[in-house]
């Protein structure tokens, strides 16, 4: 017999990516390959690329959320490098992490020294009260 019509044999389960197993959007397999090819260590454990992909995904989501808020504050629907710059520099922890990073087309934060601002006169102080 040719084996047609035989019931039996094991049905192989549908392949599931390591990213979907970990509940991530970032590619765990690609991170693992890059860790191996990058000569960071002789061997790479199974959990290392999952952890690194999760950290990268978290940082990306955090920056994109803040940049989206900056875009919305400027009444724009598209995130541009300026919004990324504003998001990173206005967040204390992200600014510390990316302090030495230059963002192309990012511009600078608006900042006027207090001594350069016009001084309040007595008449302005009375009006403001």
From Swiss-Prot:
Record bears the keyword Hydrolase: no
Residues where N6-lactoyllysine is found: 10
Bias type Basic residues, positions: 7-19
Location(s), subcellular: Nucleus; Chromosome
Modified residues (Phosphothreonine): 121
Entry comment on modification after translation: Monoubiquitination of Lys-120 (H2AXK119ub) gives a specific tag for epigenetic transcriptional repression. Following DNA double-strand breaks (DSBs), it is ubiquitinated through 'Lys-63' linkage of ubiquitin moieties.
Alphabetized PROSITE patterns for the sequence: HISTONE_H2A
Residues found modified as N5-methylglutamine: 105
Molecular function via GO: DNA binding; protein heterodimerization activity; structural constituent of chromatin
Residues with N6-acetyllysine modification: 6, 10
Function according to Swiss-Prot or TrEMBL: Core component of nucleosome. Nucleosomes wrap and compact DNA into chromatin, limiting DNA accessibility to the cellular machineries which require DNA as a template. Histones thereby play a central role in transcription regulation, DNA repair, DNA replication and chromosomal stability. DNA accessibility is regulated via a complex set of post-translational modifications of histones, also called histone code, and nucleosome remodeling.
Family indicated by similarity: Belongs to the histone H2A family.
Subunit structure: The nucleosome is a histone octamer containing two molecules each of H2A, H2B, H3 and H4 assembled in one H3-H4 heterotetramer and two H2A-H2B heterodimers. The octamer wraps approximately 147 bp of DNA.
Name of the protein: Histone H2A.J
